[in-house]
Protein backbone atom coordinates (compact mmCIF):
# COMPACT_ATOMS: atom_id res chain seq x y z
CA UNK A 1 0.00 0.00 0.00
CA UNK A 2 1.63 3.32 -1.01
CA UNK A 3 2.73 5.84 1.56
CA UNK A 4 1.09 9.24 1.36
CA UNK A 5 3.72 11.88 0.74
CA UNK A 6 2.73 15.19 2.24
CA UNK A 7 4.19 18.51 1.20
CA UNK A 8 4.19 20.27 4.57
CA UNK A 9 5.03 23.72 3.21
CA UNK A 10 2.58 26.50 4.15
CA UNK A 11 -0.46 26.42 1.90
CA UNK A 12 0.04 22.84 0.79
CA UNK A 13 -1.55 19.64 2.03
CA UNK A 14 -1.41 15.94 1.14
CA UNK A 15 -1.31 15.28 -2.56
CA UNK A 16 -1.04 19.00 -3.30
CA UNK A 17 -4.46 19.74 -1.77
CA UNK A 18 -4.55 23.02 0.11
CA UNK A 19 -5.74 22.48 3.69
CA UNK A 20 -8.72 24.48 4.91
CA UNK A 21 -8.07 27.63 6.93
CA UNK A 22 -7.56 27.34 10.67
CA UNK A 23 -10.41 28.10 13.06
CA UNK A 24 -13.25 25.94 14.31
CA UNK A 25 -15.97 27.74 12.36
CA UNK A 26 -14.22 27.18 9.03
CA UNK A 27 -12.93 23.69 9.79
CA UNK A 28 -16.26 21.95 10.47
CA UNK A 29 -17.30 20.13 7.32
CA UNK A 30 -20.78 21.22 6.20
CA UNK A 31 -23.47 18.56 6.44
CA UNK A 32 -21.23 15.90 7.97
CA UNK A 33 -23.01 15.92 11.34
CA UNK A 34 -26.32 15.15 9.62
CA UNK A 35 -25.06 12.27 7.49
CA UNK A 36 -22.14 10.52 9.21
CA UNK A 37 -23.41 7.46 11.13
CA UNK A 38 -20.71 7.89 13.79
CA UNK A 39 -21.71 11.46 14.60
CA UNK A 40 -25.40 10.60 14.50
CA UNK A 41 -24.88 7.76 16.98
CA UNK A 42 -22.93 10.10 19.25
CA UNK A 43 -26.03 12.32 19.24
CA UNK A 44 -28.12 9.33 20.37
CA UNK A 45 -29.68 8.78 16.99
CA UNK A 46 -30.01 5.40 15.29
CA UNK A 47 -28.49 5.53 11.80
CA UNK A 48 -29.25 2.80 9.29
CA UNK A 49 -26.13 0.86 10.26
CA UNK A 50 -24.19 0.74 13.51
CA UNK A 51 -21.00 2.81 13.15
CA UNK A 52 -17.70 1.14 13.97
CA UNK A 53 -14.11 2.14 14.58
CA UNK A 54 -11.35 0.49 16.62
CA UNK A 55 -9.20 1.92 19.38
CA UNK A 56 -5.57 1.60 18.23
CA UNK A 57 -6.76 0.99 14.67
CA UNK A 58 -3.84 3.21 13.62
CA UNK A 59 -0.76 1.37 14.79
CA UNK A 60 1.40 -1.68 14.99
CA UNK A 61 -1.30 -4.13 13.90
CA UNK A 62 -0.76 -2.90 10.32
CA UNK A 63 2.32 -3.98 8.33
CA UNK A 64 2.33 -0.67 6.47
CA UNK A 65 2.54 1.12 9.83
CA UNK A 66 5.48 -1.01 10.92
CA UNK A 67 7.23 -0.31 7.62
CA UNK A 68 6.68 3.43 7.93
CA UNK A 69 7.80 3.49 11.57
CA UNK A 70 10.97 1.44 10.97
CA UNK A 71 13.84 3.33 12.58
CA UNK A 72 11.57 6.17 13.74
CA UNK A 73 10.96 6.69 17.46
CA UNK A 74 7.33 6.73 18.58
CA UNK A 75 7.43 10.30 19.83
CA UNK A 76 9.12 11.47 16.65
CA UNK A 77 6.31 9.96 14.59
CA UNK A 78 3.79 11.82 16.77
CA UNK A 79 5.49 15.15 16.05
CA UNK A 80 5.64 14.92 12.27
CA UNK A 81 2.52 16.11 10.44
CA UNK A 82 3.27 13.94 7.41
CA UNK A 83 3.63 10.76 9.47
CA UNK A 84 0.59 11.56 11.62
CA UNK A 85 -1.48 12.00 8.48
CA UNK A 86 -0.33 8.81 6.80
CA UNK A 87 -0.67 6.66 9.94
CA UNK A 88 -4.15 8.01 10.65
CA UNK A 89 -5.25 7.22 7.08
CA UNK A 90 -3.83 3.68 6.93
CA UNK A 91 -6.67 1.95 8.81
CA UNK A 92 -9.26 4.03 6.95
CA UNK A 93 -8.02 2.48 3.72
CA UNK A 94 -7.88 -0.99 5.28
CA UNK A 95 -11.12 -1.26 7.23
CA UNK A 96 -13.37 1.56 5.99
CA UNK A 97 -14.34 2.42 9.57
CA UNK A 98 -16.95 5.06 10.30
CA UNK A 99 -14.36 7.30 11.98
CA UNK A 100 -10.63 7.94 11.94
CA UNK A 101 -8.75 8.71 15.13
CA UNK A 102 -5.88 11.17 15.18
CA UNK A 103 -2.57 9.37 15.63
CA UNK A 104 -0.72 10.57 18.70
CA UNK A 105 0.18 9.51 22.24
CA UNK A 106 -1.20 10.76 25.54
CA UNK A 107 2.23 12.01 26.67
CA UNK A 108 2.76 14.22 23.60
CA UNK A 109 1.51 17.42 25.32
CA UNK A 110 3.73 16.70 28.33
CA UNK A 111 6.79 16.30 26.12
CA UNK A 112 5.77 19.48 24.28
CA UNK A 113 6.04 21.52 27.49
CA UNK A 114 9.54 20.23 28.16
CA UNK A 115 9.18 17.10 30.29
CA UNK A 116 11.78 14.38 29.73
CA UNK A 117 9.63 11.39 28.78
CA UNK A 118 10.51 8.48 26.53
CA UNK A 119 8.27 5.72 25.21
CA UNK A 120 10.19 2.49 25.77
CA UNK A 121 9.23 -0.52 23.69
CA UNK A 122 7.57 -3.17 25.82
CA UNK A 123 7.17 -0.80 28.77
CA UNK A 124 5.45 2.42 27.75
CA UNK A 125 6.06 6.01 28.84
CA UNK A 126 9.02 6.42 31.20
CA UNK A 127 9.41 9.74 33.04
CA UNK A 128 12.99 10.78 33.84
CA UNK A 129 12.02 13.01 36.77
CA UNK A 130 8.73 11.95 38.40
CA UNK A 131 6.44 14.68 39.70
CA UNK A 132 5.88 14.13 43.43
CA UNK A 133 6.10 17.54 45.05
CA UNK A 134 5.52 21.27 44.54
CA UNK A 135 8.82 21.61 42.69
CA UNK A 136 7.72 19.05 40.14
CA UNK A 137 4.35 20.74 39.82
CA UNK A 138 6.04 24.07 39.09
CA UNK A 139 7.76 22.49 36.09
CA UNK A 140 4.42 21.91 34.40
CA UNK A 141 3.97 25.08 32.39
CA UNK A 142 0.96 25.91 30.25
CA UNK A 143 0.70 24.35 26.80
CA UNK A 144 0.55 26.86 23.94
CA UNK A 145 -0.60 26.11 20.38
CA UNK A 146 2.89 26.92 19.13
CA UNK A 147 4.21 24.00 21.21
CA UNK A 148 2.36 21.54 18.96
CA UNK A 149 2.21 23.06 15.45
CA UNK A 150 2.27 19.60 13.88
CA UNK A 151 -1.11 18.81 15.44
CA UNK A 152 -3.07 21.52 13.66
CA UNK A 153 -1.14 20.91 10.44
CA UNK A 154 -1.96 17.20 10.49
CA UNK A 155 -5.64 17.79 11.28
CA UNK A 156 -5.95 20.12 8.30
CA UNK A 157 -4.17 17.67 6.02
CA UNK A 158 -6.49 14.91 7.22
CA UNK A 159 -9.64 16.94 6.66
CA UNK A 160 -8.57 17.36 3.05
CA UNK A 161 -8.22 13.57 2.65
CA UNK A 162 -10.97 12.02 4.76
CA UNK A 163 -14.00 13.13 2.77
CA UNK A 164 -17.10 12.02 4.66
CA UNK A 165 -15.20 10.13 7.38
CA UNK A 166 -15.25 11.96 10.73
CA UNK A 167 -11.98 12.57 12.56
CA UNK A 168 -11.71 11.95 16.31
CA UNK A 169 -9.21 13.92 18.36
CA UNK A 170 -7.98 12.58 21.65
CA UNK A 171 -6.02 13.24 24.81
CA UNK A 172 -5.19 11.55 28.08
CA UNK A 173 -7.33 12.40 31.09
CA UNK A 174 -5.74 14.22 34.06
CA UNK A 175 -5.72 11.18 36.35
CA UNK A 176 -3.97 8.89 33.89
CA UNK A 177 -1.38 11.57 33.07
CA UNK A 178 -0.85 12.17 36.79
CA UNK A 179 -0.31 8.47 37.39
CA UNK A 180 2.43 8.29 34.76
CA UNK A 181 4.10 11.40 36.15
CA UNK A 182 3.96 10.30 39.78
CA UNK A 183 4.87 6.65 39.25
CA UNK A 184 7.52 7.44 36.65
CA UNK A 185 5.91 5.00 34.22
CA UNK A 186 3.20 2.33 34.06
CA UNK A 187 2.15 0.82 37.38
CA UNK A 188 0.21 -2.25 38.49
CA UNK A 189 -1.05 -0.82 41.77
CA UNK A 190 -0.66 2.98 41.42
CA UNK A 191 0.58 3.01 45.01
CA UNK A 192 2.59 6.25 44.79
CA UNK A 193 -0.28 7.94 42.99
CA UNK A 194 -2.83 7.01 45.63
CA UNK A 195 -0.42 7.82 48.46
CA UNK A 196 -0.02 11.38 47.17
CA UNK A 197 -3.75 11.65 46.52
CA UNK A 198 -4.62 10.69 50.10
CA UNK A 199 -1.77 12.37 51.97
CA UNK A 200 -1.46 15.67 50.09
CA UNK A 201 -4.89 16.51 48.69
CA UNK A 202 -4.02 20.17 48.04
CA UNK A 203 -1.00 19.21 45.96
CA UNK A 204 -3.05 16.49 44.28
CA UNK A 205 -5.83 18.81 43.17
CA UNK A 206 -3.31 21.45 42.07
CA UNK A 207 -1.54 18.83 39.95
CA UNK A 208 -4.74 17.55 38.36
CA UNK A 209 -5.96 21.09 37.74
CA UNK A 210 -2.70 21.87 35.91
CA UNK A 211 -2.99 18.68 33.88
CA UNK A 212 -6.62 19.48 33.08
CA UNK A 213 -5.46 22.81 31.68
CA UNK A 214 -2.79 21.10 29.57
CA UNK A 215 -5.22 18.47 28.29
CA UNK A 216 -7.83 21.12 27.48
CA UNK A 217 -5.26 23.17 25.57
CA UNK A 218 -4.13 20.09 23.60
CA UNK A 219 -7.71 19.25 22.68
CA UNK A 220 -8.46 22.88 21.87
CA UNK A 221 -5.78 22.83 19.18
CA UNK A 222 -7.41 19.76 17.66
CA UNK A 223 -10.97 21.08 17.86
CA UNK A 224 -10.06 24.48 16.46
CA UNK A 225 -8.24 22.77 13.59
CA UNK A 226 -11.40 20.84 12.78
CA UNK A 227 -11.71 17.42 14.43
CA UNK A 228 -15.31 16.22 14.50
CA UNK A 229 -15.32 14.56 17.93
CA UNK A 230 -12.95 13.94 20.80
CA UNK A 231 -12.16 11.07 23.15
CA UNK A 232 -10.76 11.53 26.65
CA UNK A 233 -8.80 8.41 27.61
CA UNK A 234 -8.60 7.64 31.33
CA UNK A 235 -6.73 4.38 31.02
CA UNK A 236 -6.02 3.94 34.73
CA UNK A 237 -9.27 5.24 36.26
CA UNK A 238 -10.33 1.66 36.97
CA UNK A 239 -7.75 1.58 39.77
CA UNK A 240 -10.11 3.73 41.86
CA UNK A 241 -13.34 3.01 43.69
CA UNK A 242 -16.32 5.20 42.91
CA UNK A 243 -16.04 7.42 45.99
CA UNK A 244 -12.39 8.24 45.33
CA UNK A 245 -13.07 8.76 41.64
CA UNK A 246 -15.84 11.24 42.37
CA UNK A 247 -13.80 13.09 44.99
CA UNK A 248 -10.33 13.19 43.49
CA UNK A 249 -10.73 12.78 39.73
CA UNK A 250 -14.16 13.48 38.27
CA UNK A 251 -14.13 17.28 38.83
CA UNK A 252 -10.97 17.62 36.75
CA UNK A 253 -12.15 15.41 33.90
CA UNK A 254 -15.46 17.29 33.98
CA UNK A 255 -13.67 20.59 33.49
CA UNK A 256 -11.91 19.25 30.40
CA UNK A 257 -15.13 17.92 28.89
CA UNK A 258 -17.07 21.08 29.74
CA UNK A 259 -14.66 23.15 27.66
CA UNK A 260 -16.08 21.55 24.49
CA UNK A 261 -19.77 21.34 25.37
CA UNK A 262 -21.89 22.05 22.31
CA UNK A 263 -18.90 22.02 19.93
CA UNK A 264 -18.18 18.35 19.20
CA UNK A 265 -19.32 15.02 20.65
CA UNK A 266 -17.27 14.03 23.70
CA UNK A 267 -16.38 10.39 24.41
CA UNK A 268 -15.09 9.36 27.85
CA UNK A 269 -13.35 5.99 28.12
CA UNK A 270 -11.52 4.04 30.80
CA UNK A 271 -10.54 0.43 31.35
CA UNK A 272 -12.06 -1.69 34.12
CA UNK A 273 -14.47 1.12 34.96
CA UNK A 274 -17.69 -0.85 35.29
CA UNK A 275 -18.36 0.62 38.74
CA UNK A 276 -17.53 4.14 37.52
CA UNK A 277 -19.76 4.30 34.45
CA UNK A 278 -22.42 6.53 36.00
CA UNK A 279 -19.81 8.93 37.35
CA UNK A 280 -17.98 9.04 34.02
CA UNK A 281 -21.20 9.91 32.25
CA UNK A 282 -22.02 12.57 34.82
CA UNK A 283 -18.60 14.12 34.22
CA UNK A 284 -20.00 15.47 30.98
CA UNK A 285 -19.55 12.86 28.28
CA UNK A 286 -21.97 12.54 25.39
CA UNK A 287 -20.72 8.98 24.84
CA UNK A 288 -19.35 6.67 27.51
CA UNK A 289 -16.87 4.04 26.39
CA UNK A 290 -17.33 0.62 27.99
CA UNK A 291 -14.75 -2.15 28.25
CA UNK A 292 -15.68 -5.77 27.59
CA UNK A 293 -16.44 -6.69 31.20
CA UNK A 294 -19.93 -5.15 31.35
CA UNK A 295 -22.63 -5.98 28.76
CA UNK A 296 -23.73 -2.84 26.93
CA UNK A 297 -27.37 -3.07 27.95
CA UNK A 298 -26.32 -3.22 31.61
CA UNK A 299 -23.78 -0.44 31.01
CA UNK A 300 -26.49 1.78 29.55
CA UNK A 301 -28.63 1.14 32.63
CA UNK A 302 -25.75 2.11 34.94
CA UNK A 303 -24.88 5.22 32.95
CA UNK A 304 -28.44 6.47 32.82
CA UNK A 305 -30.34 8.49 30.22
CA UNK A 306 -28.85 11.14 27.99
CA UNK A 307 -25.78 9.22 26.82
CA UNK A 308 -24.73 6.95 23.98
CA UNK A 309 -22.38 4.05 24.60
CA UNK A 310 -19.26 2.88 22.78
CA UNK A 311 -17.83 -0.62 22.74
CA UNK A 312 -17.35 -3.30 23.65
CA UNK A 313 -16.09 -6.48 21.96
CA UNK A 314 -13.39 -8.29 23.94
CA UNK A 315 -10.15 -7.57 22.02
CA UNK A 316 -9.24 -11.27 22.26
CA UNK A 317 -12.46 -12.33 20.50
CA UNK A 318 -10.70 -11.72 17.18
CA UNK A 319 -8.72 -14.93 17.83
CA UNK A 320 -11.88 -17.04 18.14
CA UNK A 321 -13.24 -19.25 15.32
CA UNK A 322 -15.32 -17.21 12.91
CA UNK A 323 -18.73 -18.50 14.09
CA UNK A 324 -17.83 -17.62 17.69
CA UNK A 325 -16.56 -14.19 16.68
CA UNK A 326 -19.65 -13.49 14.59
CA UNK A 327 -21.93 -14.47 17.47
CA UNK A 328 -20.05 -12.16 19.83
CA UNK A 329 -20.25 -9.26 17.38
CA UNK A 330 -23.98 -9.79 16.96
CA UNK A 331 -24.43 -9.92 20.74
CA UNK A 332 -22.60 -6.62 21.22
CA UNK A 333 -24.73 -5.00 18.52
CA UNK A 334 -27.96 -6.37 19.99
CA UNK A 335 -27.11 -5.15 23.48
CA UNK A 336 -25.91 -1.81 22.13
CA UNK A 337 -29.26 -1.35 20.42
CA UNK A 338 -30.79 -1.14 23.91
CA UNK A 339 -28.85 2.08 24.54
CA UNK A 340 -29.89 5.52 23.28
CA UNK A 341 -27.02 5.40 20.79
CA UNK A 342 -24.26 2.90 20.04
CA UNK A 343 -20.83 3.15 18.43
CA UNK A 344 -19.26 -0.29 17.97
CA UNK A 345 -15.68 -0.64 19.15
CA UNK A 346 -13.49 -3.04 21.02
CA UNK A 347 -13.53 -2.93 24.80
CA UNK A 348 -9.89 -1.78 24.72
CA UNK A 349 -7.23 -1.27 22.08
CA UNK A 350 -6.48 -3.62 19.19
CA UNK A 351 -3.93 -6.22 20.31
CA UNK A 352 -0.70 -6.11 18.26
CA UNK A 353 -0.96 -9.75 17.12
CA UNK A 354 -4.43 -9.19 15.62
CA UNK A 355 -4.90 -10.12 11.96
CA UNK A 356 -5.95 -6.93 10.13
CA UNK A 357 -8.18 -9.03 7.90
CA UNK A 358 -10.20 -10.11 10.92
CA UNK A 359 -10.77 -6.48 11.90
CA UNK A 360 -12.02 -5.78 8.39
CA UNK A 361 -14.37 -8.75 8.76
CA UNK A 362 -15.65 -7.42 12.10
CA UNK A 363 -16.39 -4.07 10.47
CA UNK A 364 -18.32 -5.88 7.72
CA UNK A 365 -20.27 -7.89 10.29
CA UNK A 366 -21.22 -4.73 12.18
CA UNK A 367 -22.34 -3.11 8.95
CA UNK A 368 -24.51 -6.13 8.20
CA UNK A 369 -22.17 -7.93 5.84
UniProtKB/Swiss-Prot annotation:
Assigned keywords, A-Z: Cytoplasm, Decarboxylase, Lyase, Porphyrin biosynthesis
Record EC number: 4.1.1.37
SUPFAM superfamilies referenced in this protein's UniProt entry, alphabetically: UROD/MetE-like
Catalytic function, reaction form: uroporphyrinogen III + 4 H(+) = coproporphyrinogen III + 4 CO2
This protein's record includes keyword Nucleotide-binding: no
Main localization of the protein described in the UniProt heading: cytoplasm
Biological or metabolic pathway of the protein: Porphyrin-containing compound metabolism; protoporphyrin-IX biosynthesis; coproporphyrinogen-III from 5-aminolevulinate: step 4/4
PROSITE patterns to which the protein is assigned, alphabetical: UROD_1 (PS00906), UROD_2 (PS00907)
Location within or outside the cell: Cytoplasm
Annotated segments matching region Disordered: 1-26
EC class of the enzyme, as a word: lyase
Gene Ontology MF terms in the entry: uroporphyrinogen decarboxylase activity
Feature type site, description Transition state stabilizer: 105
GO biological process, one term: protoporphyrinogen IX biosynthetic process
Entry function: Catalyzes the decarboxylation of four acetate groups of uroporphyrinogen-III to yield coproporphyrinogen-III.
Record protein name field: Uroporphyrinogen decarboxylase
Record organism: Frankia casuarinae (strain DSM 45818 / CECT 9043 / HFP020203 / CcI3)
